[in-house]
UniProtKB/Swiss-Prot annotation:
It catalyses: a plastoquinone + NADH + (n+1) H(+)(in) = a plastoquinol + NAD(+) + n H(+)(out); a plastoquinone + NADPH + (n+1) H(+)(in) = a plastoquinol + NADP(+) + n H(+)(out). This is NAD(P)H-quinone oxidoreductase subunit H, chloroplastic. It is found in: Plastid, Chloroplast thylakoid membrane. It comes from Anthoceros angustus (Hornwort). Keywords: Chloroplast, Membrane, NAD, NADP, Plastid, Plastoquinone, Quinone, Thylakoid, Translocase, Transport.
Length: 393
């Protein structure tokens, strides 16, 4: 019997949007030829909340609680960039103790972010067990956050000139105990995952980005370092006290999903080293909170003026942003998180431009998935690690 070969028409498939607690409200319009991906178009904007415009109608202190809603899995970094921008613009010096406290909190937040990437990423490619392991360690980090800041998430801990409160009694010892415990758990993750043959078949050679492509697309963070570019803003920009600590930039040369996994594993190890060193050499002195100092001016405080007795009668008495512009950036878990701030001799920013790492890194997704299998889309998308709160802003 003769069989006639018929070419099927391309099929268009809509992936997402999902719930924000899952893969986020990202929609992918995928065109398929059988199982092969021929085109992919990301649709954004489902989680847009106008964060930049809100910033232009708030003082920096009023805006701080909003920024933890960008990347809600690494909120310390959004707080850090929000206070760093006016600090650089107005040349405010941060006490050494406050700088060390910031480093400790940032690196704990980096570990928590990488952990909550690792669990769902493994679940996406068919391994459920690591998801429960990472929640166990992440819970310990959140306990440390709760003891120091009062909040497990959305900490609202950073302040202009320092941090909100000093570390509580006994917190340093608890954090050191966690670091000793977690170092062994990273070894456990590696034994469980890294050399697993099924895992390697799903990630090795999938979503490869060359060194030149990574630079030309403007990628940042571990997307850049996994392609052989040793670029880490903690080393490049010398912010906080990172230069006083001994640690190495983690990088790989292959540029595939496996390389991005290995960089994250390496970064968790380095973060533990940074935290341990910072806890052992953290100096004494003030932790500084400029806004709290304003409140403690006694009876003559500007806060006691009649104009402030009624809500919205007058903006809170805070410092004015000079008529200057400045770009400030930090090395967030997902890449370069930046703020372009323009002051206008007002308590409100004239322009507050957010450079989210996920938005820039997501650009390369259509190129990576073309020619791949449908099942590889979740592997590649997961290896990029995006949070739609910061992508859509």
């Amino acid at each position: 019997m003769t069989m006639l070969a018929a070419k099927a028409d391309p099929m268009t498939l809509s992936m997402g949007p999902h719930h924000p607690s899952m893969h986020g409200v990202l929609r992918l319009i995928v065109t398929l030829d059988g199982e092969n991906v021929t085109d992919c178009e990301p649709i954004l904007g489902y989680l847009h909340r106008g964060m930049e415009k809100i910033a232009e109608n708030r003082t920096i202190v009023q805006y701080l609680p909003y920024v933890t809603r960008w990347d809600y899995l690494a909120t310390m970094f959004t707080e850090a960039i929000t206070v760093n921008a006016p600090e650089k613009l107005t040349n405010i010096q941060v006490p050494k103790r406050a700088s060390y406290i910031r480093i400790i909190m940032l690196e704990l937040s980096r570990i928590a972010s990488h952990l909550l990437w690792l669990g769902p990423f493994m679940a996406d490619i068919g391994a459920q067990t690591p998801f429960f392991y990472i929640l166990r360690e992440r819970e310990m980090i959140y306990d440390l956050f709760e003891a120091a800041t009062g909040m497990r998430m959305m900490h609202n801990f950073f302040r202009i000139g320092g941090v909100a409160v000093d570390l509580p009694y006994g917190w340093v010892d608890k954090c050191l105990d966690f670091c000793d415990y977690f170092s062994l758990k990273v070894d456990e993750y590696e034994r469980l995952i890294t050399y697993n043959s099924i895992f390697l078949k799903r990630v090795e050679g999938v979503g490869t980005i060359s060194r030149e492509e990574a630079i030309n697309w403007g990628l940042s963070g571990l997307m850049l370092r996994a392609s052989g570019v040793q670029w880490d803003l903690r080393k490049v920009d010398h912010y906080e006290c990172y230069d006083e600590l001994d640690w190495q930039v983690q990088s790989q040369t292959e540029g595939d999903s496996l390389a991005r996994y290995l960089v994250r594993i390496g970064e968790m190890r380095e973060s533990v080293k940074i935290i341990q060193q910072a806890l052992k050499v953290i100096p004494g002195g003030p932790y500084e909170n400029l806004e709290a100092r304003r409140l403690n001016q006694g009876k003559d405080s500007e806060w006691n003026d009649f104009e402030y007795q009624f809500i919205s009668k007058k903006p809170s008495p805070t410092f004015k942003l000079p008529k200057q512009e400045h770009y400030i950036r930090v090395e967030a878990p997902k890449g370069e998180l930046g703020i372009y701030l323009i002051g206008d001799d007002s308590v409100f920013p004239w322009r507050w431009k957010i450079r989210p790492p996920g938005f820039i890194n997501l650009q390369i997704l259509p190129q990576l998935v073309k020619g791949m299998k449908l099942a590889d889309i979740m592997t590649i998308l997961g290896s990029i690690d995006i949070i739609m709160g910061e992508v859509d802003r």
